[in-house]
């Protein structure tokens, strides 16, 4: 007798219960339920986004293996959150798209079959879009305003302005989020749109497969049929002459047909080594939109929104603490939140700065720089007195030293923003935020200041304390 999805999930849970610790099973496995089982695809529903992410990353493959042992054939396990399924239930077949980055076709025959398939089904199953990467989940700040506006513009009117749209920025700053948001937006407006989201690696692998299987025409037909193509991590095309050649012709075919092209990279076209000049020219002919690292206020807004999406009550001082600690990219910031939530969920300890700080400190030792030490060393390097730094003096030298002191105190101690303000003569927490932002900006353009700040950090051994 064939098992229903619920029956299969019950058996899988029973098998897992004997192999997992009780806290792990009770926290992650038991709350999940089976929402569907068809076409060898078992779809599980977790109570929230955090739980679904955790279950997907850590246990989906194990669940699939156990299920295969029970029913005797391989299955695919999909893990969604309650809000994902709510969003999918009344939408397009995009809900069946896997978030894995699978090649568009494993053989030339499959590629040819896919080209001949009705456009109402194949294109919507191709993108591999993450359902969380939509515009209303993207926090816009000064660092990303232009890129966000351009992405929305091409999503609303593809192939008109900004073609191609080239989004560049460092790792974890939101490039992929914006690209996939464009794809979601187009599919929402036009469910029949042929939207392709691929990484450069996938494009290269598909090309290699097509060459080996004598399927170049099917490969070209498939990619050039796109109404909207989103190509991620184009920097990995460097030095791949044949891939660059094929992408050049694909680009021209799509652009000449008025199809929208969106490209993402960790650097501008002109800075990608061993990239053909004609590709640099093509990539630069539309709009190059840069995304910078978010400032403190934007990081706080990102954390707040993420916490709301995950239905997590996050104390404001903890938001301030995490935002001040993790400054380089959004992925790192959200990773810190994930660890904090996991820590609280597993241990049952409420999330506070005091409880979370030791766990977030990479050294596992905590940070033991004192506020007084920061003031003393900053005073020494910047040639001002400790009293000057605590005063209301607006002399440039004093003001700069005070801002650096606030910046380093945020990095080297566990003090909240209001506490840091109190240390500097009762300054408001907004003054501290402003000081941190100013130092962050100046460090990128002022080598002398960067050298002075590093000198203070060396004296305080802030970096070595974190590495221990």
Curated annotation (Swiss-Prot):
Residues 128-344 are annotated as: Domain III, AAA+ region. GO terms for molecular function: ATP binding; ATP hydrolysis activity; DNA replication origin binding; lipid binding. The keyword Nucleotide-binding applies. Residues 1-86 are annotated as: Domain I, interacts with DnaA modulators. Keywords: ATP-binding, Cytoplasm, DNA replication, DNA-binding, Lipid-binding, Nucleotide-binding. SMART domains: AAA, Bac_DnaA_C. Residues 345-468 are annotated as: Domain IV, binds dsDNA. InterPro entries: AAA+_ATPase, Chromosome_initiator_DnaA, Chromosome_initiator_DnaA-like, Chromosome_initiator_DnaA_CS, DnaA_C, DnaA_dom, DnaA_N_dom, DnaA_N_sf. GO terms for cellular component: cytoplasm; plasma membrane. Residues 86-127 are annotated as: Domain II. ATP binds at residues 172, 174-176. GO terms for biological process: DNA replication initiation; regulation of DNA replication. It is found in: Cytoplasm. Belongs to the DnaA family. Oligomerizes as a right-handed, spiral filament on DNA at oriC. Domain I is involved in oligomerization and binding regulators, domain II is flexibile and of varying length in different bacteria, domain III forms the AAA+ region, while domain IV binds dsDNA. Plays an essential role in the initiation and regulation of chromosomal replication. ATP-DnaA binds to the origin of replication (oriC) to initiate formation of the DNA replication initiation complex once per cell cycle. Binds the DnaA box (a 9 base pair repeat at the origin) and separates the double-stranded (ds)DNA. Forms a right-handed helical filament on oriC DNA; dsDNA binds to the exterior of the filament while single-stranded (ss)DNA is stabiized in the filament's interior. This is Chromosomal replication initiator protein DnaA. The gene is dnaA.
């Amino acid at each position: 007798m064939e098992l229903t999805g619920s029956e299969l999930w019950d058996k899988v849970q029973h098998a897992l219960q004997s192999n997992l610790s009780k806290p792990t099973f009770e926290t992650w496995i038991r709350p999940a339920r089976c929402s569907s089982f068809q076409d060898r695809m078992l779809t599980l529903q977790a109570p929230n986004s955090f739980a679904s992410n955790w279950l997907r990353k850590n246990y989906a493959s194990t669940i699939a293996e156990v299920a295969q042992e029970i029913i005797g054939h391989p299955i695919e396990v999909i893990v969604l959150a309650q809000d994902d399924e709510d969003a999918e239930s009344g939408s397009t077949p995009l809900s069946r798209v896997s978030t894995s980055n699978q090649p568009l076709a494993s053989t030339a025959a499959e590629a040819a079959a896919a080209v001949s398939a009705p456009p109402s089904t194949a294109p919507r199953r191709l993108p591999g879009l993450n359902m969380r990467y939509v515009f209303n989940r993207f926090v816009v700040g000064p660092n990303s305003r232009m890129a966000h506006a351009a992405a929305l513009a091409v999503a609303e009117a593809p192939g008109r302005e900004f073609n191609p749209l080239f989004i560049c920025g460092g790792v974890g700053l939101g490039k992929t989020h914006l690209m996939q948001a464009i794809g979601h937006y187009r599919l929402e407006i036009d469910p029949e749109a042929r939207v392709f989201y691929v990484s450069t690696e996938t494009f290269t692998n598909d090309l290699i497969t097509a060459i080996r299987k004598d399927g170049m025409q099917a490969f070209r037909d498939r990619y050039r049929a796109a109404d909207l193509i989103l190509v991620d991590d184009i920097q990995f095309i460097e030095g791949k002459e044949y891939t660059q050649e094929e992408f050049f012709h694909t680009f021209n075919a799509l652009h000449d047909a008025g199809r929208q092209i969106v490209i993402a990279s960790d650097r501008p076209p002109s800075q990608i080594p061993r990239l053909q000049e004609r590709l640099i020219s093509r990539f630069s002919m539309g709009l190059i939109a840069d995304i910078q690292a978010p400032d403190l206020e934007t990081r706080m807004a990102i954390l707040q929104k993420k916490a709301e999406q995950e239905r997590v009550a996050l104390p404001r001082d903890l938001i301030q603490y995490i935002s001040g600690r993790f400054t380089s990219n959004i992925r790192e910031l959200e990773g810190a939140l994930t660890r904090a939530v996991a820590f609280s969920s597993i241990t049952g300890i409420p999330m506070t700065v005091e409880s979370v700080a030791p766990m977030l400190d990479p050294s596992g030792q905590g940070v033991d720089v004192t506020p007084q030490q920061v003031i003393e060393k900053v005073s020494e390097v910047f040639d001002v007195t400790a009293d000057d730094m605590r005063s209301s003096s607006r002399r440039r030298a004093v003001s700069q030293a005070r801002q650096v002191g606030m910046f380093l105190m945020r990095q080297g101690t566990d003090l909240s923003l209001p506490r840091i303000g109190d240390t500097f003569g009762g300054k408001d927490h907004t003054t501290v935020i402003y000081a941190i932002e100013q130092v962050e900006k100046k460090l990128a353009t002022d080598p002398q200041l960067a050298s002075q700040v590093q000198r203070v950090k060396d004296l305080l051994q802030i970096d070595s304390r974190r590495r221990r």
